[in-house]
Regions:
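C-terminal helix-rich "cap/oligomerization" subdomain common to oxidoreductases
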Residues: 1-16, 82-84, 312-362
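Predominantly a Rossmann-like dinucleotide-binding segment in NAD(P)-dependent oxidoreductases
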Residues: 134, 141-220, 347
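Hydrophobic residues in well-ordered beta-strands that form the structural core
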Residues: 29, 68, 108-110, 135-137, ...
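Contiguous beta-strand/loop segments that form the cofactor/metal-binding neighborhood of enzyme cores
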Residues: 2-6, 189-275, 305-322, 338-339, ...
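Short active-site oxyanion
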Residues: 42-46, 81-83, 185
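Beta-loop-alpha module in the N-terminal Rossmann-like domain of NAD(P)-dependent dehydrogenases
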Residues: 62-127
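Active-site loop of classical SDR/Rossmann-like NAD(P)-dependent oxidoreductases
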Residues: 28, 50, 298-311
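N-terminal Rossmann-like dinucleotide-binding module
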Residues: 2-62
């Protein structure tokens, strides 16, 4: 009988009562972050938004005691020890600069993507390094239960040497209004989940090859409404992402990893939010001789993974270590996103080292 304890849940620290100041009061903060924090017993103490009425509504729905009209006022509150940002990427650097300058702020959880450009992301990490502020990033797919389970199988060697991996998304994201002027939508705002998940599971690839096209169902200018990519690894592994954001029916996300000794496959439960269903994993090995293990759980990516992204930052503050998903972690992912854009614009395979070196990332 295979060991099916797959460590799908977050490993929370002993201290979870840091005062959290929330910047942003849209869907992701109101309906995902705050419910997850309350369920985990975390302590949101204040919230601010560009639209104060939204902040008041989110506070009432999620028992947040203080509401500020501006994020600057929130940062001045000495009860705020962790700043949780859910703002557009091109506005996060300014907030991080200000938050890191406050001596009572011990940590910052930035939304991904942390910035619109790789250069801004590098600057964000430098700012927090200079002040000693812990910078975590909300790469929440790393805490999707099926991804945690798959990572456990890979780390235990259950699947042998990975040969091919794939994430196939046929689901239509809701592109928020702030995204539309960017001109870059799928790779920067959706594929980044899958690119980062591949890095979490397998590390950095050597090269990326990308094909992308606009989504004909949208009337705003953009270059990448659909994105398809292959990550080429030094050991021969190929990780393939097919992000079809055009689809209008039968929304789903499937993934599969095949190794020399086993196969794992599963689904991501996100496309049917808000009704919601858990992600899944099925796996087998040569040793299991055709039997598939099919563990199941009640937790979902949205909102339960967000306990993990905040919890890993709290643990870093508690233990005075680098966050598991740190600013430096996201630099590798942002460099991969930059390489992906360069690949489809220039029609070539782009080495990841090319964009990392240009940005001065070790």
């Amino acid at each position: 009988m295979a060991d099916v304890d797959l460590n799908t849940g977050p490993d929370l620290p002993e201290k979870t009562d840091f005062g959290i100041g929330c910047i942003g009061a849209g869907f992701i903060m109101r309906d995902i972050h705050l419910p997850a924090y309350n369920e985990a017993g975390f302590r949101p103490v204040a919230i601010a938004s560009r639209t104060p009425a939204n902040a008041r509504t989110a506070a009432e729905e999620n028992r947040v005691p203080k509401v500020y009209d501006t994020w600057q006022e929130l940062l001045d509150d000495p009860d705020v020890e962790i700043v949780d940002i859910a703002y557009p990427p091109d506005q996060q650097l300014e907030i991080v600069r200000e938050a890191a300058s406050r001596p009572h702020v011990k940590g910052i959880l930035a939304q991904k993507p942390v910035a619109f450009t790789l250069e801004e992301a590098v600057e964000m990490v430098k700012v927090c390094d200079q002040t000693g502020t812990k910078l975590g990033v909300n790469h929440n797919m790393r805490y999707d239960q099926s991804m945690r389970a798959l990572k456990t199988l890979l780390d235990r060697g259950e699947l042998g040497t990975p040969v091919v991996a794939e994430i196939v998304m046929n689901a239509r994201p809701h592109w928020q209004e702030f995204i539309k002027p960017y001109g870059q939508i799928a790779l920067l705002n959706m594929s980044i989940h899958h690119l980062d998940a591949f890095r979490y599971l397998f590390g950095d690839p050597e090269r990326v090859v990308v094909s992308a096209r606009p989504d004909p169902s949208h009337d705003f200018p953009h270059e990448d409404g659909l994105a398809f990519y292959i990550l080429e690894y030094a050991d021969g592994l190929r990780a393939i992402g097919l992000d079809n954001c055009f689809t209008w029916v039968d929304h789903r996300i499937d993934w599969r990893v095949e190794g020399t000794e086993g196969v794992a496959k599963g689904t991501i439960g996100w496309p049917d939010y808000p009704e919601g269903s858990p992600s899944t994993i099925d796996w087998t090995t040569r040793e299991l001789d055709g039997k598939w293990e099919q563990p199941r759980w009640k937790e979902r990516w949205f909102p339960h993974a967000f306990k993990g992204t905040m919890g890993q930052l709290m643990r870093a503050i508690q233990d005075d270590v680098e966050p598991e998903i740190s600013g430096r972690t996201t630099l590798g992912t942002m460099a991969l996103v930059e390489a992906a854009y360069r690949s489809f614009r220039e029609g070539r395979a782009v080495p990841l080292e090319e964009t990392r070196a240009e940005a001065g990332i070790a």
